[in-house]
Amino acid sequence: MKNILIVFVCIVMLGACNKKEKTTFEFLYPVSETRKVDLEFRDERITLKFVSGDSLQKASISLVLSGGEYARLWVGEFPYIVWLKAGKPWVARFQGNQWRFEGKGADVNSYLNKRNGEQIYFIDYYRIANREFRKKLDRVINKQKEDLYAANLDPEFVKQEIKRLRYERNRHLASGVVSGNVKDGKMDVLDDSYGELQKVIIEDSASWEIPGYRESIDMIVHALAKLEESPDKFHDVLLNVLNRTVSTYTDRRLVEYIVNKNVMSYVKGLGTENIEEIDPIFREWVHQPNLVAAYDELCNTNKKLS
């Protein structure tokens, strides 16, 4: 009888954890703003439909959620990370290029969108020596972790945010290699860079929806390729990226993402010359119709111009 009771309690608890709930999120946007606002969530990107008032445009979206998940709010080309959780609605007001939050889910989202403190900027990848960049990176990420623990936020969010900060750190680490200075054919990176990158190239399919996960893996693969090949041999670097990706990762979503991103970037920059080895890899691993159509259109345009 005791064992039956324990099983019953576990079933009830599991059902409560998996309970789905529709939650509504509201958005207030200045009438003077002309940039569109998109919500990127679960690999879909939805353009918000605003209704104009006297001084604000208003929009809302209701989502069926069973827990907390990351999403991105795009204002034009600028992304803002948000946290969507069942039973934790919020209202977001856009002011001075920032989202400000009110409601049950405001604490986590206010944390995600605060701008105080030291930041990593793109120019840091090449403006300062790699040794100094690495020190700054560790300093910034450690401070962000301190702030996270001090904020006393939802434990479910904290667990995911620790992962996100790790991917953010890895992406910056790799970007310092990819976009760093090259002097006399040699890259300005610390001797331990290759080993550090090898440690963090690990696949984690459970992190697919965490912002920065797929971007960090892509950047790490690119950085390793630049360290193994001559950094100015773009064709060799790309082949290294593609071969490492298809031989290392089992999540086809991740493989498709990296292959598509790097091949498209290469063709946009250098055209279709010397893609005989590249094209079959793209065809084998990229299957989303919209991605294939965009690639075909780009190749056809380049062939007409050549």
Please give the residue ranges for each predicted region.
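Bacterial Sec-dependent N-terminal signal peptides
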Residues: 1-24
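Generic structural signal for short, flexible, solvent-exposed coil/loop and linker residues
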Residues: 3-6, 26-28, 154, 280
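Intrinsic disorder/low-complexity detector
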Residues: 5-8, 40, 45, 304
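N-terminal non-cleavable signal-anchor helices
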Residues: 8-13, 38, 52, 109, ...
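A non-transmembrane, solvent-exposed segment enriched in polar/low-complexity residues
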Residues: 17-157, 164, 172
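Oxidative protein folding and maturation machinery
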Residues: 96-306
